[in-house]
Amino acid sequence: ATVICIDPRLSNTASKADHWFSAWPGTEAFLLLAIARLLIRDGTWDATFFERWVNWETFLTESRPDLDPVFANVGPALLELYAEYTPEAAARICGIDEDRLRTVARTIGEGLGGFASHTWRASSAGNEGGWMVARCLQLLTVLTGSVGTVGGTNANGWNKFIPVTPLHPEPQGRWNEMQWPSEYPLSHHEMSILLPHFLKAGRGYLDTYFTRVYNPLWTNPDGFTWMEVLRDTDKIGCHVALTPTWNESAWFADYVLPMGIASERHDVASFETHNGRWIGFRQPVARRHRELNGETVERTHEANPGEVWEEQEFFIDLSWRIDPDGSLGIRSQFESIQDPGKPLTLDEYYSMLFENSVPGLPEEAEALGITPLEYMRRKGSFSLPGDQTQVYERDVPAVDLEGAVRDAKGVWRRPGTAGSHESLEEIRGHMPFIGDGSPAVEIDGEARFGFPTPSKKLEFYSE
């Protein structure tokens, strides 16, 4: 493979790369668009993929109403759109070698379907508008038809697996303006860094505030404002710090509860490591060791060094104390199904999870003569069957289209539901809240899975 590195530093990666661009910080997006323009100009882009999986019709209709909405007009329209992003301009603005830029563009164009890319914090987080770097890099992935291909670039969610929890209440209907303020409607994460400022502005009052493995006084901007608010009982009534370490914020908490690290608690994990999916099971090793030696452990903190809490057990116990008679509708979410009237145990919880939400695991465990929970306890992880190549090209069976209506653009719509990540028939797992629940898009007369966007395609132009 040819390695291309864009980094103002002579990093370890840059030192091993075939081509290194030491672009002026903040100009990386310009450089990438210059490469994109060369691909289109020279005809070395994957026009077939672009026509099939990009919403180019919307792009032409909305931005170029003077042109007929036919694919033959897409290339010329893109060249006009990116007219200023010439190799000469990129060399001047980015401080790079023009000939090397042309060479790199040719190299990328010669490897359609095999463009693997990655961006991290430097250019994206270090500059205002740095998020455009990731978007422009993804444009190269699309122009080369390298989305989800062997040797290409996967969406990270395709290689993670999140099982559906066995018990899950309906989402609450109240919007939290303290965490999701209306001033930032497009924020990807909650605006927790602004919480003390909202409290000082009189927007609200926190009766009870949990900080879970979170040290805002040290981590967030303007730590002294956090210190001020954490000490002010008129702003926060009770502060509970759930933390594995003593820290600056815990100093100002009413209660400090030691929380376990990965080897002291139960949890599931999944990361994008290869062209497949897997799920891992974290468990308290001291408790597991004692149980293997014949001991009975009722609560994990009895086995953990320093009586460290197992936080899922903590919240189950806390919920039962908050709602002892079940009148608030809280206790029922943490009540045993096998033994009604008693709290849910983690053995029961994870048994339900592994038996019903991880495809292939029950069969694998049965072949060994053990339960799915015992399988995960012994082996620690499970690799799900199948690969994740070109997820969007998967056929969608008719059963998944039930209740959906095909619109004028070929999208099978099922409004009002969270988007599933894959075939509903195949799995009881999903990447939550992606898409709008539309199960498929029609491509050449066939229902395909597509992408979790309103058009079910890669959106060059979003309405």
Residue ranges and their predicted role:
Residues K16-A17, F71-V74, Y85-A89, H118-S124, ...:
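Flexible glycine/proline-enriched surface loops and loop-helix/loop-strand junctions
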Residues L81, R102-S117, L195-D207:
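Glycine-rich phosphate/diphosphate-binding loops that line cofactor/substrate pockets in enzymes
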Residues T2, R9-L112:
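Long, well-ordered, tryptophan-enriched scaffold segments
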Residues W45-F49, L101-R102, F115-S117, G145-N156, ...:
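Acidic/polar loop patches that form or flank catalytic/metal-binding clefts of enzymes
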Residues R92-I96, W120-E128, K160-I162, Y214-L217:
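Conserved short loop/turn motifs at secondary-structure junctions
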Residues P284-Q390, A398, A404, G410:
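Long, C-terminal catalytic modules of enzymes
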Residues A1-I4, F30-L33, Q138-Y255, G260-V268, ...:
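Extended redox/cofactor-interaction regions of prokaryotic respiratory oxidoreductases
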Residues A1, W20-T27, P65-P69, N73, ...:
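Alpha-helix capping and helix-loop boundary segments enriched in small/acidic/polar residues
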